Amino acid sequence: MDLKQYITQVKDWPKPGVNFKDITTIMDNGAAYKYATDQIVEYAKEKQVDIVVGPEARGFIIGCPVAYAMNIGFAPVRKKGKLPREVISYEYELEYGTNVLTMHKDAIKPGQRVLITDDLLATGGTIEATIKLVESLGGIVAGIAFIIDLKYLNGMEKLKGYDVISLVEYEVE
């Protein structure tokens, strides 16, 4: 299945000059959503993962059905102040400022093989922060899976040394 045909491009959103790649049109098509999920499940099985981790919000949309299909857990990564128990945090740079991601301190056990999922790889900052959180808890990043890789933003540079798949690639904006 060619998933690219199910991705809607929205020009000048959320700001002028951006050509937004909207995956909700994959999600609202049962066959496309199942296909994307199944592709990531097969990858995760090859990597023998124990748990899936995803940053809010679209990492949940991708990761939860994968975890469910594999009968394994899902650990959310959230913005500061959104998780109710003791957390670890990681601050990272944005184009204009910083952001902080957190996860529960007991979400990953040392030695667990982790699949990190998100909808889209852009600059790689969010996933790099997620990797830092997982590894600080002793988790092993066995694989990283995206629906979309915006290759022209060079996010893969931050993920060197990790096994990464993306189901759709855009070479140019």
UniProtKB/Swiss-Prot annotation:
Superkingdom in the source lineage: Bacteria
Gene Ontology biological-process annotations: adenine salvage; AMP salvage; purine ribonucleoside salvage
Top EC class of this enzyme: transferase
MF-aspect GO terms: adenine binding; adenine phosphoribosyltransferase activity; AMP binding
Pfam families: Pribosyltran (PF00156)
Localization (cell): Cytoplasm
EC number annotated for this UniProt entry: 2.4.2.7
Cited CDD domains: PRTases_typeI
Reaction(s) catalysed (UniProt annotation): AMP + diphosphate = 5-phospho-alpha-D-ribose 1-diphosphate + adenine
UniProt GO cellular component terms: cytoplasm
Pathway: Purine metabolism; AMP biosynthesis via salvage pathway; AMP from adenine: step 1/1
Keywords: Cytoplasm, Glycosyltransferase, Purine salvage, Transferase
Stored InterPro entries: Ade_phspho_trans, PRibTrfase_dom, PRTase-like, UPRTase/APRTase
Transmembrane segments: none
HAMAP family: Aden_phosphoribosyltr (MF_00004)
Family in the record: Belongs to the purine/pyrimidine phosphoribosyltransferase family.
Subunit comment: Homodimer.
NCBIfam families: apt, PRK02304.1-2, PRK02304.1-3, PRK02304.1-5
Role played: Catalyzes a salvage reaction resulting in the formation of AMP, that is energically less costly than de novo synthesis.
Protein's recorded name: Adenine phosphoribosyltransferase
Species whose genome carries this gene: Macrococcus caseolyticus (strain JCSC5402) (Macrococcoides caseolyticum)
